[in-house]
Swiss-Prot record:
Keywords: Electron transport, Membrane, Mitochondrion, Mitochondrion inner membrane, NAD, Respiratory chain, Translocase, Transmembrane, Transmembrane helix, Transport, Ubiquinone. Its EC number is 7.1.1.2. This is NADH-ubiquinone oxidoreductase chain 4L. GO terms for cellular component: mitochondrial inner membrane; respiratory chain complex I. GO terms for biological process: ATP synthesis coupled electron transport. Its main location: mitochondrion.
Length: 98
């Protein structure tokens, strides 16, 4: 395992620890999730490039599409919660029942 792989895995781990520590605010959780997705994208891209498996070239792009969808839904929830309650606490997500 190269130094680049170790750094990316460490970045993913730090993002996961940040997500577990700062889970009370939605904005902090979304930032940690975005950094996790970015490190997964870089790791997937490096893995595909190192393996020379041409059929898997689309996998990092699909991961980016899912990351963009996750970010859009998360920001929509953040705007909805902050407009309704004035804060971005995750505990307010339980109050959004339809």
């Amino acid at each position: 395992m190269t130094l680049i792989h170790m750094n990316i895995i460490m970045a993913f781990s730090m993002s996961l620890v940040g997500l577990l520590m700062y889970r009370s605010h939605l904005m902090s959780a979304l930032l940690c999730l975005e950094s996790m997705m970015l490190s997964l994208f870089i790791l997937a891209t490096l893995t595909v490039l190192n393996s020379h498996f041409t059929l898997a070239n689309i996998m990092p792009i699909i991961l980016l599409v899912f990351a963009a969808c996750e970010a859009a839904i998360g920001l929509a929830l953040l705007v909805m919660i902050s407009n309704t309650y004035g804060t971005d606490y995750v505990q307010n997500l339980n109050l959004l029942q339809c």
